[in-house]
Amino acid sequence: MHLLRTLLLRSNTSNISLLTKCAFRACPLQKWPVSLRSGCQVSVLPTQQKKWLHSQPKQQDSSTKTPVHDLPSGSQHQSEESSPSAKSSISTDTSIVAETDPLQDQSIGLLKRFKKTFKQHGKVLIPVHLVTSSFWFGSFYYAAMKGVNVVPFLEFIGLPDVIVNILKNSQGGNALTAYAMYKIATPARYTVTLGGTSLSVKYLRKYGYLSTPPLVKDYFQDRMEETKELFTEKMEETRDIISGKMEETKDRISEKLQETKDRVAFRKKKNEEM
């Protein structure tokens, strides 16, 4: 039995060696994954001695950028925490815009600046506008008297034929021509009015005829101080009222206690006498 076992083992080993030789001749280099967790690979080389070569796992390329949604939450919080500075800068920018005078603000249109100046400096703008408008209309009327014809200019601009025909066939004469020129020069008139208003306001403020408006920041600060004072006064009043009520209730309770003490003492005396 022992001899049979040894023969069988030798035959099996010879078959295995033949199979391995054939496999090495068919493919000289083969790779088998050994561990899935580590990602290593084993390479078998057909040499006289069997050599097992471990290849390192592929490292991730550092040049590849991680998308924004794969970033950790801490980096996102840091990016969000940088937003208050932007908010504060926006708030300061808005306060600066609010503090600018419409006469000096060149970021808005001419008509809007004219309306804002009318709301803020209406008492100065109206006389200046009347004076400049009378000057404009007078100069245009004088030009119409001297024979200035506006119709070719209106046709060149491209105004509707209805307006051009009214000026051609009108009996108004110089007045209508002057009015047409007056309306055409509206942007120039508004610009001159704003310039005159600015100079007038500076002159009146310089000599004390017009008070300089406070800044928006100072105005809000004054209002906050006023509301704070009113709030403290109301709190003191309510505190005094509550303290007075507490004193009244304390006096009443002390009176009731004294009455009950007197009654108890009187009853004790009665019981002792009896």
UniProtKB/Swiss-Prot annotation:
Pfam families recorded: FAM210A-B_dom
Membrane-related topology note: Single-pass membrane protein
Source species, domain of life: Eukaryota
Coiled-coil zones: 221-274
Biased amino acid composition, Low complexity: 81-91
Ranges annotated as biased composition (Polar residues): 51-66
Keyword flag Cell division: no
Keyword Coiled coil: yes
UniProt keyword list: Coiled coil, Cytoplasm, Membrane, Mitochondrion, Transmembrane, Transmembrane helix
GO cellular component, one term: mitochondrion
Main location: membrane
Residues in DUF1279 domain copies: 105-217
Role: May play a role in the structure and strength of both muscle and bone.
Name of this protein: Protein FAM210A
